[in-house]
């Protein structure tokens, strides 16, 4: 991911990164998440192009956030200065998604989610 950021050079006003998948799935992460050395854009597996069943052609992997932030089938990446809620975030899931802080939902309990 660092190689991409070196080429793109997001502006200093960039606060968020929005990933858009071929299947319409979207997720947004804070810019700090993509600057993490743990984060990566996977394009291959064992020297071969990443198979669709594993999220190819491009999959973002951000292991220090909840799994819904690691989108598959990436077709677009937007660097933005404002928050765009992704698929799960529009449904009440946390935008920051830190599992160590148990940031699963925007509110600790989302009304109706157990129904």
Regions found by a protein language model. Give the residues of each.
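Structured, non-membrane catalytic/scaffold regions adjacent to prosthetic-group chemistry
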Residues: 1-115
């Amino acid at each position: 991911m660092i190689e991409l950021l070196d080429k793109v050079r997001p502006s200093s006003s960039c606060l968020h990164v929005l990933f858009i998948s071929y299947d319409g799935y979207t997720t947004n992460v804070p810019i700090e998440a993509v600057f993490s050395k743990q984060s990566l854009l996977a394009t291959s597996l064992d020297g071969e192009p990443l198979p669709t069943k594993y999220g190819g052609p491009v999959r973002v992997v951000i292991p220090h956030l909840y799994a819904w932030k690691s989108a598959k089938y990436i077709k677009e990446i937007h660097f933005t200065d404002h928050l765009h809620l992704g698929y799960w975030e529009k449904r009440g899931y946390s935008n920051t998604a830190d599992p160590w802080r148990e940031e699963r939902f925007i509110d600790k309990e989302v009304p109706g989610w157990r129904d």
